[in-house]
Each structure stands twice: as structure tokens, then as C-alpha cells.
Amino acid sequence: MFLTLIAAIISFMVSAFTMPYFIKFYQLKKIGGQQMHEDVKQHLAKAGTPTMGGTVFLLVATAVSLLVSLFSIKNTQSLALISGILSIVVIYGIIGFLDDFLKIFKQINEGLTAKQKLALQLAGGLMFYFLHVSPSGISSINVFGYQLPLGIFYLFFVLFWVVGFSNAVNLTDGIDGLASISVVISLVTYGVIAYVQSQFDVLLLIGAMIGALLGFFCFNHKPAKVFMGDVGSLALGAMLAAISIALRQEWTLLIIGIVYVLETSSVMLQVSYFKYTKKKYGEGRRIFRMTPFHHHLELGGLSGKGKKWSEWQVDAFLWGVGSLASLLVLAILYVF
């Protein structure tokens, strides 16, 4: 536990100290910044804000985790577990970096195409499975204490889990501070689970990432001076999926990650309903004012009859939902 605190403090300090230099470098080089969605007019003022800040907190958390673990953890199995989780973080970080690079430096608005991104994500998921999951012999899902054997189909579950939550966190990263603190809440919850399980190696990694994210949040809260970019959001989603697998608590991510699930579901429902109504009535209709869900809240709150919500209101609401969901999981696991 002491080492986790040390890792968190070091990561926070390095991340918070380094981020201003990253922002300044971005501005001095006059690198093109984040593009904004025109349908949310209050976001247009953010155009040009430095992005790819995830590069900094990922490098910090990875370096601190490895350094502290190498000097403190002598168990080869524990080091392998940490390296396994870090590998998927790095792989998905590279995918996100490539996507951001094409958008910002090559002026390709779409970045990677959907097919290219999915292919790279699946390749990264396969590497994670065959190098770190398969050798452990895990082939079942823990559901409320019961083992659901999947056999070879566990491979497809891992791919679905990692790719799905990677993209879900990416969708969540749409307003200042939302994704960074939502992930901190999720990581704190998994930190408690790791502590109860005496998985101190995983706890160390969680602590380092929490510290790095909080350092990043000092510059990502409204009004944001920097965004994490795909390099950060894709890696964080993959990390949460990998941690849930490592702790054998896969099902909990559906509740702990309720915000990401809600954001993704809103997009899927909106697209499906629009296509269905266009085919049936000749015109597409919408369930939400705009998706992902945080934009729906921005444009009229929950009811849609009141005033538009500020980003702080949306943040507070969704952070609250995530916190309550996380407390529910801990209560299910350790109280009821």
C-alpha cells in the first residue's frame, strides 16, 4: 500500500509538472489542435486547444509503474502481470497516437478509418490474449462468484471486452474533465478490489495511473487547456478491461463503467433508431437530442424542458452516476 501511494504521488507530481511544457511546446510549434463539433456551439471556442495530452500521462504512469515495481517486486509472476496490463495500455496508446497524428499533423480529419482502427485494436487484443491471458490458463468468466466456462470462446470475449471498452471511453471523452475523472473513479474502485484480493502489483499500477490522471486533470478541467486525445482515451479503456480480467471481476466493469456503457449505448440506439425510422417513415428520427449522451445533457438536461446544462453540471451528474455505481459493486462484493 505504501508503494502504491509513492507511485501515485510521483506520477501526480511528474504529470502536473510536465503538462505545462507539453502545452507550451504545442502552442509554440503552432500545431493544429482539437476540432470541435459544430452542433454544440458552446464548444466552438475550444477549437485549437492542444490535444494528445494522454501521451504525457501514459508515459509517466508506465515509467513510474515499471521503476517502482522493478525495485520493489521480486515475484516474477507479479512482474509478468504488470507487464501484461501495461502492454495493452501501450499498444492501444500507440493506436490512439497514430489516429491523433493523422488528424493533427497530416490534416486527415477522419484519422484512421473505422476499419483500420478496428483491425489494429483486434491485433492488439490478440497480442494481449496470446502473450498474457492464454498462458495463465484462464478460460472462464467470474459472474457473481460462479465460473462460466467459455473455453476457446474466452478469446472472443477478451477481444470484445478490450476493444469495446476502449472505444467506450473514447466516446466518453467529449467534454472537459469527464473521461479523466470518470476513469479515476473506476480505477479507485478497482484499487479497492485489488487491495482486498491482495493483488498489490495491480494496485501499484492503478495508483500510478490515478496520480498521472489527476496531474493531467489540473489542466483538463473546464476550461480545458489540453485534451487527452485518442492516445489517452483508447489506452485507458483498454486498461480498465485488462484490469477487470486480471482481477477476475469482468462483470463488474459493466456497472463500474456504467458511464461508458451509457455513452456507447446512446450512440448505438440513436444510429439504429434513425436507420429504422428512415426506412419505415422516409425520414430519420432521433431518441436523443445528440449523442454521445453527455451532449444530450448539454443540450437540455435530463428532461429537455429546462435550460442547457453547463459542462460542470454534466460532469457532476455523470461522475455521481459513476460513483454510485462503483459503490454498488463494492456493496455487492463485500457487504451483501
Curated annotation (Swiss-Prot):
Disulfide bonds: none
Annotated signal peptide: none
Cofactor: Mg(2+)
Transmembrane segments: 3-23, 53-73, 78-98, 118-138, 143-163, 174-194, 200-220, 226-246, 251-271, 316-336
Known catalytic reactions: UDP-N-acetyl-alpha-D-muramoyl-L-alanyl-gamma-D-glutamyl-L-lysyl-D-alanyl-D-alanine + di-trans,octa-cis-undecaprenyl phosphate = Mur2Ac(oyl-L-Ala-gamma-D-Glu-L-Lys-D-Ala-D-Ala)-di-trans,octa-cis-undecaprenyl diphosphate + UMP
UniProt pathway annotation: Cell wall biogenesis; peptidoglycan biosynthesis
UniProt KW keywords: Cell cycle, Cell division, Cell membrane, Cell shape, Cell wall biogenesis/degradation, Magnesium, Membrane, Metal-binding, Peptidoglycan synthesis, Transferase, Transmembrane, Transmembrane helix
Top-tier EC class: transferase
GO BP annotations listed: cell division; cell wall organization; peptidoglycan biosynthetic process; regulation of cell shape
Enzyme Commission number(s) of this protein: 2.7.8.13
Cellular component GO terms, alphabetical: plasma membrane
Main location: membrane
Pfam families membership: Glycos_transf_4 (PF00953), MraY_sig1 (PF10555)
Record's bilayer topology term: Multi-pass membrane protein
InterPro entries: Glycosyl_transferase_4, PNAcMuramoyl-5peptid_Trfase, PNAcMuramoyl-5peptid_Trfase_CS
Compartments it resides in: Cell membrane
Similarity comment: family membership: Belongs to the glycosyltransferase 4 family. MraY subfamily.
Reported function: Catalyzes the initial step of the lipid cycle reactions in the biosynthesis of the cell wall peptidoglycan: transfers peptidoglycan precursor phospho-MurNAc-pentapeptide from UDP-MurNAc-pentapeptide onto the lipid carrier undecaprenyl phosphate, yielding undecaprenyl-pyrophosphoryl-MurNAc-pentapeptide, known as lipid I.
Listed NCBIfam families: mraY
Protein name: Phospho-N-acetylmuramoyl-pentapeptide-transferase
Natural source organism: Streptococcus pyogenes serotype M49 (strain NZ131)
Gene giving rise to this polypeptide: mraY
